Regions:
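Short functional hotspots at interaction and active-site rims
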Residues: 1-230
């Protein structure tokens, strides 16, 4: 028996299936570790933070290139719009940390993000804080560097770092900061040079800093609501 694609589509619809854009998960992810994080590890971190008066932040790094494009624009029917952009290639790296209360701290760097850059960001994150910080990060090598460990020990309890389960970026609300910056900041800007890219990135990050309710919304996605403020 042979079926056309249209017939197959109708049969799938009758079974209650729809065509959807899938979510991608690394096959290396360990579901047991993810479940333990959601049900045991993070609740312990939250309880400990409450006991010592610490504020929880989620941190992440990302990069953006001059050739990043997304979104749509208007044009007469049948005429594909053309946006003139530079053919040059340049990029920026970004670091940010967000809290369930809606606080956002960030740093933009040219070049790689190694241990010393991460330490510089940690110093900025701690600046002006009168309470300890519990920082949740992924397994990036910079986060596990010995120099970072020594720096943390020198702070005498002002900073404590916890690690997300491996290959689990969807558990980090800070990932949604980058989605916002790239799609609502960079994608809507005309980028003709490095300064334009920097202006678009910093402008969007500063906007998010001034709108804590938007930052809080990153903790209400299906995969991140476990970390929302209580």
């Amino acid at each position: 028996m042979k079926l056309s694609l249209a017939s197959i589509g109708r049969l799938l619809a009758q079974l209650g299936l729809t065509c959807q854009k899938p979510l991608f998960r690394a096959y290396q992810q360990n579901p047991t570790l993810v479940e333990a994080w959601l049900q045991t590890e993070y609740p312990k971190i939250r309880a400990q933070a409450k006991r010592v008066g610490a504020e929880i932040f989620f941190e992440d790094e990302s990069g953006v290139r001059s050739d990043f494009h997304s979104g749509t624009t208007w044009a007469p029917k049948g005429q594909t719009p053309i946006v003139r952009v530079t053919g040059a290639r340049f990029s920026l790296n970004m670091i940010s940390a967000i809290s369930p209360r809606g606080t956002l701290r960030f740093m933009v760097v040219r070049g790689g993000v190694g241990a010393q850059v991460f330490i510089t960001f940690l110093k900025r994150l701690l600046a002006g804080m009168d309470h300890p910080i519990f920082l949740i990060v992924d397994g990036h090598p910079a986060h596990r560097a010995k120099s970072v460990q020594r720096f943390m020990e020198s702070l005498e309890g002002r900073l404590k770092i916890f690690f997300l389960p491996p290959y689990s970026p969807e558990l980090n609300p800070d990932e949604l900061v980058w989605n916002d910056v790239k799609n609502r900041g960079v994608a809507r800007a005309i980028v003709n040079g490095p300064r334009d890219l920097l202006r678009a990135v910093v402008g969007r990050l500063r906007y998010l800093q001034k709108t804590p309710n938007m930052v809080q919304s990153f903790f209400h996605a299906p995969e991140t609501r476990y970390a929302a403020a209580m």
